[in-house]
């Protein structure tokens, strides 16, 4: 009922039902299977809103955190709007509140709410860097160095490196290190790849061709 009301915008929306009498288990299963062919799955955004309506803690915490940065979760790209809601949930559920908080802080501080900066691959790329390097990753240096290039250039470099969010993590790490020659001042690309892949399990990269960039 909550989901129907949420999607339709009204609690007075009629819901069509059919009642079957004296069904055997096999017939019931067959009816259910056939009905699922015509069921439109809810989008991640609709599921997120339904969880908010249900008062679930994870989604309430995520919403409040996003709001605290002057951002919002939505379905259409716009400045300061995060459309990659399932990515935000995955980061929170796997890495916790403080990591998600830092990811958002770096993202907004680096690109100042650019609508292209909240893609799944960029959010996951930042998450990878934070997970691997922790406090070795200097937030102010990140914002200065990585923020010096456009999202368009970042996307281009990432695609040249490799597919998915690891390409973005590599591209951001290259910009972060800049021309530093002292190994003690550089973050190691080898370390980024040396960590067990299990640390990144649960982070789903975007496969949408237009997800990364909107603009000329």
Residue ranges and their predicted role:
Residues 2-216:
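Accessory terminal alpha-helical modules
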């Amino acid at each position: 009922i909550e989901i129907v009301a949420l999607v339709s915008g009204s609690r007075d929306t009629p819901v069509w039902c059919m009642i079957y009498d004296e069904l055997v288990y096999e017939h019931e299963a067959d009816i259910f299977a056939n009905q699922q062919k015509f069921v439109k799955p809810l989008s991640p955004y609709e599921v997120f809103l339904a969880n908010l309506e249900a008062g679930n803690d994870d989604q309430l915490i995520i919403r409040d955190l996003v709001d605290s940065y002057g951002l919002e979760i939505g379905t259409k790209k716009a400045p300061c709007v995060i459309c990659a809601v399932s990515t935000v949930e995955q980061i929170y559920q796997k890495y916790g509140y403080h990591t998600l908080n830092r990811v958002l802080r770096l993202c907004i501080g680096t690109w100042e709410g650019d609508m292209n900066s909240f893609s799944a691959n960029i959010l996951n790329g930042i998450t990878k860097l934070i997970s691997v390097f922790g406090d070795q990753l200097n937030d102010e240096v990140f914002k200065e160095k990585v923020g010096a290039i456009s999202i368009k250039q970042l996307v281009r470099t990432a695609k040249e490196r490799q597919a998915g969010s690891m390409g973005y993590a590599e591209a951001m790490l290259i910009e972060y290190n800049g021309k530093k020659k002292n190994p003690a001042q550089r973050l190691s690309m080898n370390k980024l790849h040396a960590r067990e892949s299990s640390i990144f399990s649960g982070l789903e990269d975007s496969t949408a061709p237009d997800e990364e960039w909107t603009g000329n």
